[in-house]
Amino acid sequence: MAFYRRRISPIPPGQPIDYKDVDLLRRFITERGKILPRRVTGLTAKQQRQLAVAIKRARIMALLPFLNLEG
């Protein structure tokens, strides 16, 4: 019988994901500016949805780029 280690979310479950926290949001996007999938980030489904909304809001407010074509 296999035992699976429970994955720990990189963001505590009670901590809000704010679109103004650019340093936090940058940890979950690629170098090209794409949102990383849940299997890579290790977030819960609810946190991943909140993260996607926060990143999209930050892009609209020009806090994050839509595309990062540098480098």
Swiss-Prot record:
Q: Which InterPro entries match?
A: Ribosomal_bS18 (IPR001648), Ribosomal_bS18_CS (IPR018275), Ribosomal_bS18_sf (IPR036870)
Q: Which domain of life is it from?
A: Bacteria
Which UniProt keywords are present, listed alphabetically?
A: Ribonucleoprotein, Ribosomal protein, RNA-binding, rRNA-binding
Is Lipid biosynthesis there in the keyword field?
no
Q: Mind listing the GO molecular function terms for this protein?
A: small ribosomal subunit rRNA binding; structural constituent of ribosome
Of the GO CC terms on this record, one is: ribosome
Annotated GO biological process: translation
Q: Which family does it belong to?
A: Belongs to the bacterial ribosomal protein bS18 family.
Subunit relationships: Part of the 30S ribosomal subunit. Forms a tight heterodimer with protein bS6.
The record's function comment reads: Binds as a heterodimer with protein bS6 to the central domain of the 16S rRNA, where it helps stabilize the platform of the 30S subunit.
Q: What is this protein called?
A: Small ribosomal subunit protein bS18
Write down the species: Thermosynechococcus vestitus (strain NIES-2133 / IAM M-273 / BP-1)
Tell me the lineage of the source organism. Bacteria, Bacillati, Cyanobacteriota, Cyanophyceae, Acaryochloridales
| Gene transcribed to yield this protein | rpsR
